[in-house]
Amino acid sequence: MADTLDLGSSAFGCKGSSPFLRTTMIGQPCVDFFFFFFFFFKKKKKKMITFLYKPKKISSAKFLRQWSKTNLIKKAGHAGTLDPLASGLLLVATEDDTKLLQYLDQKTKTYLAKIQFGFWSTTYDAEGQIYGVEQPIKVTKDNLEQALNRLSESQKQVPPVFSSKKVSGKSAYHYARQGKQIELKPISIKISKTILINFDEKLQNCVIMWQVSRGCYIRSLADDLGKMLKTRAYLSDLERTKIGNFDKKFLNQSLKPQDLFDLQQVKLDLENLELLLQGKKINYFAKNSELNTLIFKDEVVGFGKIINNVLITKKLFGNRIKKIINT
């Protein structure tokens, strides 16, 4: 006969009718309280993808840890780190959906950036040591607009030394904090849209809306802009307003993963899943395409390409597929 636990018994010397509100014979909270805490307040597996709004003065990692703790989330990850200076949208996934983040992080990102001219920063933003420029050149609106047009054509960018870019296995900022000179390689970027929102000629600052590709550093754009104008500049404030086509309207909503991918969807049945798990190709009559989202009901189970009406997998989430097949 199997052992059973009777929460209504007096095995722990408890008195009172409620299994969670009783006290011991000496008036201390009953052990039953701890069973209540364990069953109702332990961290739960809540699978979701959502957008959160990160405030200023906190790192993305710390913000996510606090959110996970508050919502009793066991495992969570985010895509597209925001510096502590910045606020705005952060793409977050939990449990198995964290595996999708590297694929979701390909979207363009839109920012509102406030830039101060006539000064420069060791980190290119307000978090570093800020120094004034001797005999600064006054920026005019015409000169600013011309420089923005030139900057929007940039296809390469050197990341800031105070960044998480890896150098010999360590983040660049690790060397920068020690005063060591390092050289970072330029990365490919694309500036899709540039709009000058506001320019204050008296205070020598401006607000710019930039839509950029993944990996683009807005503080590097601010520094480059200052140099183009034959002065210096730093990023004094930053807000991420959109990720792809998703803005603040989508905050705190649990979203279907397939709705976040800008890819053609290939819908599969159970038989297809079993064949793919065995490493077999399956016929799928559609136009040739290099990357597609593989869907079973509401689950993203992998990615694949279609060549000559044959589906060839690029990435399969095997454990997820096995779980589907076995249920």
Swiss-Prot record:
Keywords: Isomerase, tRNA processing. Its EC number is 5.4.99.25. One of its GO terms (biological process) is mRNA pseudouridine synthesis. InterPro entries: PsdUridine_synth_cat_dom_sf (IPR020103), PsdUridine_synth_N (IPR002501), tRNA_psdUridine_synth_TruB (IPR014780). The active site is at residue 83. It holds the Pfam family TruB_N. Belongs to the pseudouridine synthase TruB family. Type 1 subfamily. Responsible for synthesis of pseudouridine from uracil-55 in the psi GC loop of transfer RNAs. This is tRNA pseudouridine synthase B. It comes from Mesomycoplasma hyopneumoniae (strain 232).
